[in-house]
Amino acid sequence: MQPSFRIVADGTDVTQQLNDRLLKLTLLDKPGMESDSLTLKIDDRDGQVALPRRGAVLEVHLGYAGEPLMRMGRFTVDTLQWAGPPDCLTVTAKAGDMRGSGKTIRSGGWEGTTLAQVCRDVGARNGWRVECPLQVAIARVDQVNESDYHFVTRLARQYDCTAKLAEGMLMVLPRQSGQSATGRRIEPLVLGRADVGSFDVTYDDRSLMRTVKTRYQLPGSGEVKSVELKNPKAPATATGEHVDRHLYASRGEAEQAAKARLASFSRSSASVRLELPGRGDLFAERSLLLQGFKAGIDGEFLIDSVEHTYSSSGWTTVVQCNGGRVGKG
């Protein structure tokens, strides 16, 4: 099959202008505020390539000739590099416009609220639409001399969520939920050995913890209490104990933080790298089910990142996975 692409810039299809000039297209998809990116390397051999407007919006589609192309996302141009010889223009764009007010350093606090409400408040002052289905109660949370990007990322990590800004929407979603931002069920994608060009699977017991401890302070008395969460999936050889130094405002927040930290350790228990012919149905936070590889390897993993590369050599996709919430003990 012949790979194909389409690029629309500020509403104008520029595919024909780029057909014989596009040297390389790279798309990176990761869970996180500043991760999703597009890089275009364009041949400017005759000096006729005009510099795109910084802030221009690029919409990218990938697929194969004779089939409907898949929309891969919309990106805002924020970096231009022209180098030579041979003359070449490199355009970098982000799924979230990272040039806006989200990087402003702020301080503030919330009491007696929910994670969803905090996200809505942050979104409102930056002009972002917000999707956060979690009504987790928050006794108190403070933003101290940090940007909204950093603050939301920190909150998401504490509650075992991902935070992503894309196309003007802030999405804060539970990790490995199996659902899209709209609540649509996303089934694990099954990959067999024949689907993959190359693979690399690593199990690492050093990241497994038997116990995670967090602390919280009782209102009024100020007495400090602790929460201990054991890992039921930890092998007998895992004896490590992680103690979170942060002091939480309530028992509920301390318990949630312990669960999130334990899930993070579990995800680090395995890493998988797969290289395969280009396909657009692979994306960060989708569960992947490996079948027909090897006993002890087959099973479910969670996609950490996806990198698509399109060039004259074809379209390839590289997938990085982790061990998921349960881990690979």
Please report, for each region that a protein language model flagged, where it lies by residue:
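Amphipathic, non-transmembrane alpha-helical segments in extracytoplasmic/periplasmic proteins
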Residues: 39-40, 93, 105-130, 143-167, ...
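Acidic/histidine-rich, surface-exposed loop or edge segments in extracytoplasmic proteins
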Residues: 99-104
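An acidic/polar, Gly/Ser/Thr-rich interaction patch typically located in mid-to-C-terminal regions
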Residues: 21-53, 195-329
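Conserved "cap/hinge" positions at secondary-structure junctions
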Residues: 62-64, 174, 286, 292
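Extracytoplasmic/secreted envelope proteins and their assembly/folding machinery
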Residues: 74, 116-119, 149-153, 211, ...
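Short beta-strand-centered interaction patches in the first periplasmic/extracellular domains
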Residues: 1, 88, 94-97, 132-196
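Assembly/oligomerization scaffold segments
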Residues: 1-98
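Short, compositionally biased
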Residues: 74-83, 108, 176-179, 301-312
